Structure formats: structure tokens, C-alpha cells
Amino acid sequence: MKPVRMTRRGLLMAGGAAWAAQNKPHGVRFGVRSPLPKASLRERAMLVRRAGYDGIELGPEWLNQPVEAIQQQLAGTGAAVSAIVGSIELLDTDPVKRAAAVELDRQRLRMAKQLGADCVIEVPVFGPNKFQDLSPLMTAREVEEKLLVAGLKQLTGDVERTGITLLLEPCNHKETHFMNRQSQAAEIIDAVGAPGFRTLSDFYHMQLEEKDIGETLSRYGKYTAYVHLADGVKRTEPGSLPFDYRPGFRALKKWGYAGWLTVESGATDNPEAALGRALAYLKRQWSEA
């Protein structure tokens, strides 16, 4: 049998995936969504680690480059990749764009696996509804729900093969007309009816949309596989305002939550100092919940 020769690209991918698989700890981990807007990915990852966090979430600005380029930038920083974003056009009115969104999600699921990430984050659409109301046959919302479920069902095989969780993220009504609450995401997941589809519970959006975050997560926390954190309507770092995360954390603990707690916010002052304070605050709130 001839020996298999592996390229440098293959070594990077295989090594990164193996390291990630062997070094995923049990219990919650703390992450940050791409701090320092003008910094390089490496600088951001190093900042996250200096502030005491376990990893970094990657937005779309980093994902149009080869996986090995991302791995090279993160090499030696000690920062894990918690999640990456997926498409935002699964509910576009153009069927060509919807098909392209499904294909992009397939690519992102593979990329997430190569980077050792746990999840791909999906916001189906931003902005107002653009579909026609087809009543009495079907309302515009029912059209959207059926299209979204159909699009997600096309990804069930990819989710199963990669082992990556596809997250549905409910956003507040100022950002999207569709899927604003945890219950709505849960309904979509139930309609898809396949493992590997879960919700992202964003405390910033929930502050604006849910009457009681603790009660909401007591009911729907079983769907939660990832968490975003920020304080108040200005979306500042946790601990900058007197916001109590403990009721929500307590509900998540009852469901056995052991995923990422990721800060997605601005900073009230020096980013490293602000993130350090936020981490101390979140660890204290989690332990007290």
C-alpha cells in the first residue's frame, strides 16, 4: 500500500479538528463575538484570551477566506472558535437567493467542523416581511414558516454528517419581523423534526421581547444550545448596568446547559478592561444561579 501524503493544508485542518475534539471541556465556556472592530483576527483572539475568555465567535467578515488562513491567524492564541455565522437569506423572496443560502449554510457547517466550532448561527431574515398574503389559502407568515422549514430540512443531512448544531436566533422586532421570541424558534425546530437544530438564546433580544426571561427559559431552555449576553437597550458589556442574569441562568442550569456564554456587546471603556469586568460578573452570576 502506498503511503498517504498529506498536504500542509490537510495537516492544518486535521490537526485543528483533532485538537478541538480532544480539548472540549465539560461545563460552560465563556466567549466573545469579535471585539475590537479595526483589529486583526489574531489581535482579537489574543485580547479575548488576555481578558480570560475561552474563545471567540466569528462573524461574516472573517469567513470569506480559506479555513487554513483562519487557523493560521488563531494558531498559538489558545482561543477556541465557539461558533460561526451562517446565511441570512433563507427567507428571501428570490428562490435563487434561497437556494444560495442553503448552499452557504452547507459550506459553513463544513467550515465550523474544520475550525472545531460547535455551532452555526442562523438568522433567517432581517427587516420587514416581503411576501404577499395569500389568504384564505395561506397568510404571509405561514408562507415564511413553510419556506423556512423546507430550507432547514434540506440541511438535515449536512447537520448529521458534520455533527455541528444549527442555531436559530430570534432577534428583536426592530431587527426582524420574523421569529422574535424563543417560542417561535422552538416551533420551527419542532416542525423540522430532526436532531441538531437548536436555539440561540440572546439575553439582549430577550430583554426586548420576552416578559420574563427566567420563565421563558424555564419553558424553552431545553432548545437552547448557545447564549449571547449584553446589558440593556444600549447593548453594553454584562455588568455595566444593574441587569440580573441569574433568573435566566438558573433556568438554563435546570435544563443542564453546558454550552457557551458569549458576550456580544459594545464596551463602555477600554475593551480589555471592560471584558475582564464582564467575565468576573458573569462567572459570579452563573455560580450564584
Report the location of each language-model feature:
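Active-site mouth loops of central-metabolism enzymes
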Residues: 28-40, 90-102, 138-144
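N-terminal substrate-binding region of glycoside hydrolase catalytic domains
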Residues: 47-65, 85-90, 96, 100
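Active-site-adjacent beta->alpha loops and helix N-cap segments on the catalytic face
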Residues: 64-73
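Active-site acidic/histidine proton-transfer and metal-coordination neighborhood
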Residues: 15-22, 97-198
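Short catalytic-loop micro-motif centered on adjacent basic/acidic residues
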Residues: 31-32, 55-59, 168-169, 200-202, ...
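Histidine-acidic metal/acid-base catalytic patches
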Residues: 2-6, 10-30, 38-49, 116-118, ...
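Active-site-proximal loop/turn and secondary-structure-junction residues that shape catalytic pockets
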Residues: 36-38, 62, 87-90, 126-128, ...
